[in-house]
UniProtKB/Swiss-Prot annotation:
Belongs to the UPRTase family. GO terms for molecular function: GTP binding; magnesium ion binding; uracil phosphoribosyltransferase activity. It catalyses: UMP + diphosphate = 5-phospho-alpha-D-ribose 1-diphosphate + uracil. It comes from Bradyrhizobium diazoefficiens (strain JCM 10833 / BCRC 13528 / IAM 13628 / NBRC 14792 / USDA 110). Catalyzes the conversion of uracil and 5-phospho-alpha-D-ribose 1-diphosphate (PRPP) to UMP and diphosphate. This is Uracil phosphoribosyltransferase. It is an enzyme of class 2 (transferase). The keyword Transferase applies. The gene is upp. Uracil binds at residues 194, 199-201.
Amino acid sequence: MEGVTIVDHPLVQHKLTLVRDKSISTKSFRELIKEIGMLLCYEVTRDLPLADTVIETPLATMHSAKIAGKKLVFVPMLRAGTTFVDGMMDLVPTARVAHIGLYREPHSFAAVEYFFKSPSDLGERLAIVVTPVVATANTAVAAIDRLKERGAKDIRLACLIAAPEGLERLRGLHPDVPIWTAAVDEGLDENGFILPGLGDAGDRAYGTR
């Protein structure tokens, strides 16, 4: 699908297999999501602009490259997105972090917002929405809608797994938002959960039901 990149690096796929396993502990689940977040961040930021700069090494003066002209804001979707984004922050510690709290109404699957906090200069930043799962995409669409309302112009999305139905809806409503995912699963069940999926990422990360 155009605009969707599947990150098939062996390390990502290995760690995703471990994450899917229902027998792992909450601690292992959180640690693995953080590690995958770091690996996906590497791919999502691959095309950041570079500028030449002059530095002094211990032995000589040299020209070298630094990221320039692009400020970042990570946008984890609560709850499990906060664990996912920790690995990204390890790579880009100077990035800002916005938070969006959305839950999916269990009967209609509609997205309900309960929290939103972001930097005031969203229009000047590359916003990377971070969510473990894109199932129906209702919450992802609502998050992107909200970011655009607040002035964000350059938005990307990173997730662990996605359903074809969710990707189609997200790309249809926001074709300007590219997506990076570790896997595209078979589809959705009657309750809107991804099959085979990985379960409820928030519950598995924090030991709730």
